[in-house]
């Protein structure tokens, strides 16, 4: 494995059962194969992976106000919804961070980890495009050049619209079968950051 991709990191967001229900599965049936492909490519080529997951306490002490009011939240500890989708499980040594917010970058650990492991370009994939992926991508783009793997994201509503809204902030979109070509193209953004 070379260090050609040493400046890149793939961030997988909320690839958990609660965020891939039957309706989303029907609308995005290729998501599992696409995520498997991009994860395998990154692991083979030496692009580090960070896993970001939602996790909330049963006692509601860390629930966002919107959910406290509605008395319901996905990804409660011990629930079915918190389970990691089989195609997105971490390998030993791949960091996993847990969040109680839409935006992974509201956790100080997220940016600190990316800086600590000397990454200069963030590639984002995950669920749900219009919420957690959207918020994390916006925040990431303020700190690092950021790309998004469009066929490794899904949202029951507003998927394409969310991606279009992010176009102004990202270095570009990629797909699971073109990620290396696009990472090469994005290298200029690392040099200029």
Where are these regions (language model features)?
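Short acidic, Gly/Ser-rich segments with clustered Asp/Glu that frequently serve as metal-coordination loops
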Residues: 16-21
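Active-site loop/turn elements of alpha/beta-hydrolase fold enzymes
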Residues: 15, 54, 151
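Early exported N-terminus immediately downstream of N-terminal targeting peptides
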Residues: 46-49, 53-71
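Acidic-leg catalytic submotif of subtilisin-like serine proteases
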Residues: 9-15
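Short glycine-enriched, charge-decorated loop/helix-capping segments at active-site entrances
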Residues: 23-29, 68-74
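A short alpha/beta connector and helix-capping loop motif
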Residues: 6, 24-55
């Amino acid at each position: 494995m070379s260090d050609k991709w040493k400046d890149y990191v793939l961030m997988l967001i909320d690839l958990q059962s609660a965020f891939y229900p039957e309706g989303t599965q029907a609308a995005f049936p290729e998501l599992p194969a696409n995520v498997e492909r991009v994860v395998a490519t990154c692991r083979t080529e030496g692009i580090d992976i960070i896993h970001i997951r939602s996790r909330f306490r049963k006692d509601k002490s860390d629930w966002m106000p919107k959910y406290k009011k509605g008395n319901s939240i996905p990804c409660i500890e011990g629930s079915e919804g918190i389970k990691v989708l089989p195609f997105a499980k971490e390998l030993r040594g791949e960091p996993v961070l847990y969040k109680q917010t839409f935006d992974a970058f509201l956790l100080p650990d997220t940016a600190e980890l990316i800086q600590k492991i000397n990454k200069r370009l963030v590639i984002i994939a995950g669920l749900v495009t219009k919420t957690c992926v959207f918020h994390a991508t916006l925040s990431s783009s303020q700190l690092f050049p950021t790309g998004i793997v469009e066929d490794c994201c899904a949202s029951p509503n507003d998927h394409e619209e969310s991606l279009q809204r992010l176009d102004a902030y990202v270095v570009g979109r990629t797909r699971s079968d073109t990620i290396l070509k696009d990472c090469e193209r994005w290298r200029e953004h690392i040099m200029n950051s």
